[in-house]
Amino acid sequence: MKFLDQAKIYVRSGDGGNGVVAFRREKYIEFGGPDGGNGGRGGDIVFEAVENLNTLIDFRYTQHFRARKGGNGAGSDRTGAAAPPVVIKVPVGTQILDDDRETLLADLDAPGKRIVLLRGGDGGHGNAMFKTSTNRAPRRADPGWPGEERWVWLRLKLIADAGLVGLPNAGKSTFLSVASAARPKIADYPFTTLHPQLGVVRLSMTEEFVLADIPGLIEGAHDGAGLGDRFLGHVERCAALIHLIDGAAGDVVDAWRTIRGELEAYGGGLADKPELIVLNKMDAMTPHQIAGRRSALERASGCKVMVISAAAHQGVDAVLRETLRMIREQRQ
């Protein structure tokens, strides 16, 4: 399934039904009086977050949603039927933005959460509503009120407990595949992963968390370089970050600073999230190189650095345990 995390759609609620002009007509009743009923309400536009979706790809093919008009009134004071709502199902974590892509209208961040974005128009009054002591037989009925319409943007921010960040080819996809049942594409070239990947990490029957692999960032991503920073939005909801660094690539401190700079430039509190720095590919380094690069990273970051080999399954469990501890600390 293709991944799509942004979509623009048109929504319109239903018009209200028209009121009707009608008079009571029965045997032996010469002047029955007005009995025209009111129109029914138009259909609402409702958004609902559901668990079994993880992409907005459906909105690439269906971009217009219109609710039905309410039923017209009828004689004998019968009110028109209200039109059913149009329920638009979106993945959990979807934000609804105005056409300017800035104004947040709703944040559907929990399964089952619903929002009535547009209300259907009210039904018009039938002539029975206009009867007075001086106007016993009104011939006036109102049309239904029009519905509302607007263009909106849908933006998906995946719900994950921890985010996996790092430069391209740092080994993030390999780490995710080892840590969870996810099977992302893995290859020895930059930008193998083009879309965020989610995996559930199960440490025991009662201990698990969701890990998101964010496509590789490069210097200048916040200005659109590489894949840009659009996928950083998926990290905003994470409680902790695993910063994976390719230990065999050379200047590990420069690699760490590059990603830190992008997190700070993006904003949104990303730079303030708890960060676990992990030096990957220990199997491709000598013990002397491991000690030197680990020490340099710890001096630059002021944090403890863990060393692993995702490909050889070395040290991964310890990283996952520490990540779970950080998540629990943040969620309290």
From Swiss-Prot:
Residues 1-159 form the Obg domain. It holds the Pfam family GTP1_OBG. Gene3D superfamilies: GTP1/OBG domain (2.70.210.12), P-loop containing nucleotide triphosphate hydrolases (3.40.50.300). Its EC number is 3.6.5.-. Keywords: Cytoplasm, GTP-binding, Hydrolase, Magnesium, Metal-binding, Nucleotide-binding. InterPro entries: G_OBG, GTP-bd, GTP-bd_Obg/CgtA, GTP1-OBG_CS, GTP1_OBG_dom, GTP1_OBG_dom_sf, OBG_GTPase, P-loop_NTPase. Its cofactor is Mg(2+). Residues 160-328 form the OBG-type G domain. Monomer. This is GTPase Obg. It comes from Acidiphilium cryptum (strain JF-5).
